Amino acid sequence: MLAIAALVVVVAATFAVARPGEAPPAAADALQAKALGELRVFTGWLDRFGAEGYIGEVGWPDDARGDGSEWNRLASMWYDEADRARLWVTAWATGSLFGSTYRLNLYDHDGRGLVPSTQAVVVERAAPRGVHRGVAVAGGEFGTQAPSFSNEFPGTYGADYRFDPPETFSYLARRGHRLVRLPFRWERIQPQLGAPLDPLELGRLRSAVAGARAAGLSVVLDLHNFGAYRTPGGPLRLGAEISAETFADTWRLLAEAMKDTPGIVGYGLMNEPTHVQAGQAGTPERAWELASQAAVTAIRSTGERRLVMVGGYPWSSVHDWPSHHPRPWITDPRRNLRYEAHHYWDRDHSGTYPATYDDELAAAERR
């Protein structure tokens, strides 16, 4: 841990952060230029239409391969750019169920408490006034890799999945965070489509929100389902087996259940709706636009006024956002909406980072 702490200090001391009003620093290499250019695709789209944005996920590797300072230098420039665009950001990720080998884990749980990874020095930097910064606290969406996972076999709470305890949120607040994104699964919160929500799972979600709020954190609830709902017979997909009306009704129930729960700043309609099908809409993009509009309308019908985050088909990626959604598509009577994009800097934008910084740089130079 001493080596990690030393690296954090060195990296923090060497970053040159542009203050508001200053010109952005020029990219020093091709990978920095590529990442910043991709982010500007999304922020340019927002600017063109007067829309507001939220980066629900951004993540990069730790120093396990000895290149943490290079990744952090890119990250610092990326956050400068996000600050100038006044983007809300939750970095990916932390959570007590992550193993110590997960290279995007921002805070390791070492058995005695949480320990910052090398990325934390960038993520913890102060945001401009009125801009929310924080992290995703994963765990509520875990346990879905087993072939048997479904609405009928959702896993065991505390073993296969769980929300982090209040101590995690208190620690994050002490580190300067003000926002957390809480993923959860549709199959657990609503074990049968069109049926009431599960009161036990609702209670767990409310308890997690209460723990975050007690620490002074605001919460974005994140339905982490990729545009599908798992059953023993296979996935049901939005646009095909699941109608926009069914999806909207789920969000009506969620908004009714949570609208009096303090601490929630917004609702994330669907994490990376990549499994959405075209159906009668003609294209999966249009099917998602119709489903997400129906969900926003349903949420507002309950009297809920809080923010709604709307991702883009298929992976909510910044670099190709306009090619899937040339224009904003949501009409919100409350005008309290942010379009949610994600950004990973490896060449396939998967966030798996199998290559080193130097390898990714070489790939960027060949573009």
Predicted regions and their residues:
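Solvent-exposed loop/turn segments at secondary-structure junctions
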Residues: G59-D63, T94-G99, A138-G143, L179, ...
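Aromatic-rich peripheral "rim/lid" segments of glycoside hydrolase catalytic domains that contact
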Residues: A64-G130
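An active-site-proximal structural segment forming one wall of the substrate-binding cleft
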Residues: F153, Y157-L179, F184, Q190, ...
